[in-house]
Amino acid sequence: MEIKVDEGHQKGTKEDITRPLLEEDKDFPDIERTTWIQKAIGQTFQTTAHLANLLPTGTVLAFQLLSPIFSNGGQCDLVSKIMTSTLVAICGFSCFILSFTDSYKDKNGTICYGLATIHGFWIIDGSTTLPQELSKRYKLRFIDFVHAFMSLFVFGAVVLFDRNAVNCFFPSPSAEALEVLTALPVGVGVFSSMLFATFPTTRNGIGFPLSSK
């Protein structure tokens, strides 16, 4: 008995075998595509992690720890929004003011932290007093204000990368606002990294690596 095979069915089977799998859904590669904004975000996440090292460690950790709690995971009511705003303001002020702090190691190897002033160096705990000539080396300079404001901008970029904070302040952003929220921290990160690389800080204050001085 001869078994006849439908030539049309056989031909279709061969075509199915030889046809590339992805050809069945030509739209599938679209899933793999990323916009220029997404690529920029991916690169800037690494930049932000590097820039976070330029900020006081305790301040960044405090913000990252408390942000999801204060913002209720990004689902803010009036109280949560006030708490999150207060957290951002306090951490931002901390980044700014700690840029003027420095450390000093005395003859006994004790680390003393202080605040740079226009007259010299003020030891915070008052445990010691530096000689006038040595104190003048730590006095306030113009570059300290540059670093302070740049630290504030960097912290702002860190806040914009925090989804809890962004969803709290901008729960339903428009398309234009979303573009700004996405592109702004990228620009701040690149600009700040260039300035910090060009004008590196010589201070080792609170929340920064200890000074060898």
From Swiss-Prot:
Source species, domain of life: Eukaryota
Record keyword Membrane present: yes
Entry GO CC: plant-type vacuole membrane
Keywords: Membrane, Transmembrane, Transmembrane helix, Vacuole
Location in the cell: Vacuole membrane
TM helices/strands, residue ranges: 51-71, 78-98, 142-162, 180-200
One example of a Gene Ontology biological process annotation: plant organ senescence
Entry membrane topology: Multi-pass membrane protein
Known function: Involved in membrane remodeling.
Protein's name in the database: Protein DMP4
UniProt source species: Arabidopsis thaliana (Mouse-ear cress)
